[in-house]
UniProtKB/Swiss-Prot annotation:
Gene Ontology MF terms: rRNA binding; structural constituent of ribosome
A GO cellular component annotation in the UniProt record: ribosome
Family: Belongs to the bacterial ribosomal protein bL20 family.
Organism ancestry: Bacteria, Pseudomonadati, Campylobacterota, Epsilonproteobacteria, Campylobacterales
Keyword entries, A-Z: Ribonucleoprotein, Ribosomal protein, RNA-binding, rRNA-binding
Function of the protein: Binds directly to 23S ribosomal RNA and is necessary for the in vitro assembly process of the 50S ribosomal subunit. It is not involved in the protein synthesizing functions of that subunit.
Gene Ontology terms describing biological process: ribosomal large subunit assembly; translation
Gene3D superfamilies (alphabetical): 6.10.160.10, Ribosomal protein L20
Protein name: Large ribosomal subunit protein bL20
Leader sequence segment: none
Length: 117
């Protein structure tokens, strides 16, 4: 039986890894072993940060809502409690957008939350 060398398979594998490593710095882009190691690490970071992004955005929205609440003489926790008691079901993303872009509408919502307390 003839001996089969891995030439075609190896070249295809190396091309695939080096293509994904485009944009990496120095040898991490050009050398297969370094590129492969960096690519594995990069994919781990990407996986982790896709999940972390949701937490980061929620924290950002809470900071923005809290800042707008303070302008309306409310704390964030009392504001959220007031919204629940008033039966207003707006999520934090929408509330943060209103706080940034439509201050008057947010002030009305804050007043409704104050009355419900």
């Amino acid at each position: 039986m003839a001996r089969v060398k891995t030439g075609v398979v190896r070249r295809r594998k190396h091309k695939k890894v080096l293509k994904l490593a485009r944009g990496f710095y120095s040898g991490r882009r050009k050398h297969f072993r370094k590129a492969k190691e960096q690519l594995e690490r990069s994919l781990v970071y990407a996986y982790r940060d896709r999940r972390r992004k949701k937490t980061d955005f929620r924290r950002l929205w809470i900071v923005r809502i809290n800042a707008a609440c303070r302008l309306n003489d409310l704390s964030y926790s009392r504001f959220i409690n007031g919204l629940k008691k008033a039966g207003i079901e707006l999520d934090r993303k929408i509330l943060a957008d209103l706080a940034m872009n439509d201050v008057a509408a947010f002030a009305k919502i804050a007043e409704a939350a104050k009355k419900a307390l």
